[in-house]
Amino acid sequence: MFIIELIKGIILGIVEGLTEFAPVSSTGHMILVDDMWLKSSEFLGSQSAFTFKIVIQLGSVFAAAWVFRERFLEILHIGKHKHVEGDNNQQRRSKPRRLNLLHVLVGMVPAGILGLLFDDFIEEHLFSVPTVMIGLFVGAIYMIIADKYSAKVKNPQTVDQISYFQAFVIGISQAVAMWPGFSRSGSTISTGVLMKLNHKAASDFTFIMAVPIMLAASGLSLLKHYQDIQIADIPFYILGFLAAFTVGLIAIKTFLHLINKIKLIPFAIYRIVLVIFIAILYFGFGIGKGI
């Protein structure tokens, strides 16, 4: 394994860690950074490169699980744990905590069902540069609409005030985000905001709901494709995983700290700029044709 290839693995892990849970579409960034630039399939082989992306995604998912470890233990009624960062002290004293396992399950159902039904179709027909650009752009517009609406909401709800109906609707939007480029977090956070949650609450629920789904999906994919991992490539996988996990920890904590302040529009603008950049490379220079 050449040093340059290990560096490429670290770069891809960093990109995955930065983008998996941000509302900017990790798929769009992987197409730009890997398929159009680093081309891991050329030195790993297409199947092994696909497996590598599963591994680094697991790195990001483990990072989110670690950030929300106390909340997950609390939902599962294991021990005594602190509140989710950002909840209001007076609200915690005046009413019992409402977020529970049923909220998470209700939110997971739509994406789980549609994932089982359409995963193969989506993987075969929708993972192209033009379809990802459409997802990036439409998702950006949806985020802008959500932010404009949220400005009119006087008392947005915290994550512990979420209802089962709100959880279900947010879950439906997670299913819609199966369209590559749309962004799971962009879709669900926007929907949560439209359902009168504050941005931090919508983000908290998005990540809490996404972790078990992504662990299951990535875990099953890895079980299907683990035989594609070559012994010589293991350092590549380890470095990519560690990069995704480490950067993911920093990115998720930073995002949750800032989201109530900066809202979604800056991410939407970034997505539109990204679409323009990818379009120039794809249509103007033919980079990425055949993906």
Curated annotation (Swiss-Prot):
Residues that span the membrane, as ranges: 1-21, 48-68, 102-122, 126-146, 162-182, 203-223, 231-251, 267-287
Primary location recorded for the protein, binned into one broad class: membrane
Organism ancestry: Bacteria, Bacillati, Bacillota, Bacilli, Bacillales
Identification of the protein by name: Undecaprenyl-diphosphatase
Homology family: Belongs to the UppP family.
Keyword S-adenosyl-L-methionine: no
Broadest EC class assigned to this enzyme: hydrolase
Bilayer topology term: Multi-pass membrane protein
GO molecular function: undecaprenyl-diphosphatase activity
GO process terms (BP): cell wall organization; peptidoglycan biosynthetic process; regulation of cell shape; response to antibiotic
Catalysed transformations (reactions): di-trans,octa-cis-undecaprenyl diphosphate + H2O = di-trans,octa-cis-undecaprenyl phosphate + phosphate + H(+)
Further comment found in the protein's record: Bacitracin is thought to be involved in the inhibition of peptidoglycan synthesis by sequestering undecaprenyl diphosphate, thereby reducing the pool of lipid carrier available.
Annotated source species: Staphylococcus aureus (strain MRSA252)
Disulfide bridges in this chain: none
Subcellular location(s) per record: Cell membrane
A GO-annotated cellular component: plasma membrane
Record flagged with keyword Transmembrane: yes
